[in-house]
């Protein structure tokens, strides 16, 4: 520190002496740019030394710290970006897996629905066929019973018609007709109606 003060005082002595000289000529123009004045020269030298000191201070101490902060920040940002890309890739994979699961579930559900529908159709067709066969049997049985009843009724009708015809002829004519003749006439009449 002391050395700096001594250098400062010694370098300003010529400028002070020049400024104190009453016979020094006055220059026209800007006094800051009057290099004939030793004070201006010393100011320029000191300004250069101060700028050099600032440059050295900034380049050796401040700029490396700023550079370190910038590098750390860039590394942090790149790490965050990598984490974000990884998270996005994981999310995309999860979404794709979920979409695949939904597609598989839809296909399985559709297959199950088709299986259930076809089983229901087959069961309904089987039940319809069984009902149809049962109804056909019942219809055939009913037709057989009807035919049997008709035959029985027709057989009874022949006897009743024969007896009734004999009774009517006997009442109308007062004579009993022959059994064979009445049965033959009743048979012809019934045959004509059937």
UniProtKB/Swiss-Prot annotation:
Keywords: ATP synthesis, Cell inner membrane, Cell membrane, CF(0), Hydrogen ion transport, Ion transport, Membrane, Transmembrane, Transmembrane helix, Transport. InterPro entries: ATP_synth_b/b'su_bac/chlpt (IPR002146), ATP_synthase_B_chain (IPR050059). It is a single-pass membrane protein. GO terms for molecular function: proton-transporting ATP synthase activity, rotational mechanism; proton-transporting ATPase activity, rotational mechanism. It holds the Pfam family ATP-synt_B. It is found in: Cell inner membrane. The chain crosses the membrane at residues 1-21. One of its GO terms (cellular component) is plasma membrane. F-type ATPases have 2 components, F(1) - the catalytic core - and F(0) - the membrane proton channel. F(1) has five subunits: alpha(3), beta(3), gamma(1), delta(1), epsilon(1). F(0) has three main subunits: a(1), b(2) and c(10-14). The alpha and beta chains form an alternating ring which encloses part of the gamma chain. F(1) is attached to F(0) by a central stalk formed by the gamma and epsilon chains, while a peripheral stalk is formed by the delta and b chains. PANTHER family: ATP SYNTHASE SUBUNIT B (PTHR33445:SF1), ATP SYNTHASE SUBUNIT B', CHLOROPLASTIC (PTHR33445). F(1)F(0) ATP synthase produces ATP from ADP in the presence of a proton or sodium gradient. F-type ATPases consist of two structural domains, F(1) containing the extramembraneous catalytic core and F(0) containing the membrane proton channel, linked together by a central stalk and a peripheral stalk. During catalysis, ATP synthesis in the catalytic domain of F(1) is coupled via a rotary mechanism of the central stalk subunits to proton translocation. Component of the F(0) channel, it forms part of the peripheral stalk, linking F(1) to F(0). Belongs to the ATPase B chain family. This is ATP synthase subunit b 1. It comes from Granulibacter bethesdensis (strain ATCC BAA-1260 / CGDNIH1). The lineage of its organism: Bacteria, Pseudomonadati, Pseudomonadota, Alphaproteobacteria, Acetobacterales. The gene is atpF1.
């Amino acid at each position: 520190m002391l050395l700096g003060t001594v250098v400062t005082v010694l370098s300003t002595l010529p400028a002070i002496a020049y400024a104190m000289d009453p016979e020094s000529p006055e220059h026209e123009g800007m006094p800051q740019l009057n290099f004939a004045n030793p004070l201006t020269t010393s100011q320029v030298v000191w300004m250069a030394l101060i700028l050099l000191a600032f440059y050295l201070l900034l380049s050796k101490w401040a700029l490396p710290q700023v550079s370190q902060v910038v590098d750390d920040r860039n590394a942090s940002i790149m790490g965050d970006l990598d984490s974000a890309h990884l998270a996005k890739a994981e999310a995309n994979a999860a979404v794709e897996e979920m979409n695949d699961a939904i597609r598989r579930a839809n296909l399985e559900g559709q297959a199950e629905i088709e299986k259930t529908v076809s089983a229901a159709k087959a069961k309904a067709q089987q039940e319809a066929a069984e009902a149809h066969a049962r109804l056909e049997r019942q219809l055939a049985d009913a037709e057989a019973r009807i035919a049997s009843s008709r035959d029985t009724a027709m057989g009874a009708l022949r006897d009743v018609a024969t007896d009734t015809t004999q009774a009517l002829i006997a009442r109308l004519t007062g004579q009993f007709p022959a059994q064979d003749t009445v049965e033959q006439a009743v048979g012809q009449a019934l045959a004509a109606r059937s």
